[in-house]
């Protein structure tokens, strides 16, 4: 097995090192995220192509563009799913009886993640896929409804708050496959 000296990361805000700053009431970048610390500790060259709000669809587009431009590493770390499984909560609040779909339907998510893995392998890179970080359904619900979205309407559509966790877990299960 070839020793890895360089890794390209494609993912969302988690991989980018974006965190919510409670005091400032907005998102910001960590001064040094976990990926950067790991690269320094392990002596790896790191190319972080992750973007806040990125779905697997956008990530695949970025990856293709990067590879066409000559981006090359020995490994690729892929971290997607959190934004993909999310809903347009404002639309759900406005129409709790409507048919709402996640940003990336599960089947398309799986298809595009497989396409990313195939592209990485074709480039001679080793794919590394992360699972989704755990979600606390109640805290996430409180977070996205804090601006005044109708909690009652969203709860009607969800059935129960823990549906958020169960839905998120389906995308995590797809990553594990």
Where in the sequence are the language-model features?
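Alpha-helical cap/lid subdomain in secreted, periplasmic
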Residues: 2, 64-177
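Short, solvent-exposed coil/turn elements at secondary-structure transition points
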Residues: 52-54, 133
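Serine-esterase "nucleophile elbow" of acetyl-processing enzymes
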Residues: 1-50, 66-72, 76
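Short glycine-rich, polar/acidic loop-and-turn segments at beta strand-coil junctions
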Residues: 50-52, 82
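Amphipathic coiled-coil/heptad-repeat helices and related helical stalk/stem segments
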Residues: 31, 59-60, 112-113
């Amino acid at each position: 097995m070839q020793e890895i000296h360089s890794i390209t990361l494609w993912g969302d805000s988690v991989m980018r090192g974006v965190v919510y700053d409670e005091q400032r009431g907005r998102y910001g970048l960590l001064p040094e995220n976990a990926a950067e610390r790991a690269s320094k500790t392990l002596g790896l060259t790191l190319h972080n192509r992750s973007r806040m709000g990125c779905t697997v669809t956008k990530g695949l587009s970025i990856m293709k563009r990067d590879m066409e431009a000559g981006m090359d590493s020995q490994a690729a770390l892929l971290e997607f799913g959190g934004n993909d499984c999310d809903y347009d909560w404002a639309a759900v609040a406005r129409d709790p009886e409507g048919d709402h779909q996640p940003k990336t339907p599960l089947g398309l998510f799986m298809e595009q993640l497989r396409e990313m893995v195939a592209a990485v392998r074709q480039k001679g890179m080793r794919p590394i896929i992360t699972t989704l970080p755990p979600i606390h359904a109640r805290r996430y619900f409180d977070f996205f409804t804090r601006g005044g979205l109708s909690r009652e309407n969203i709860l009607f559509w969800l059935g129960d708050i823990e549906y958020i966790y169960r839905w998120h877990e389906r995308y995590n299960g797809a990553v594990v496959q």
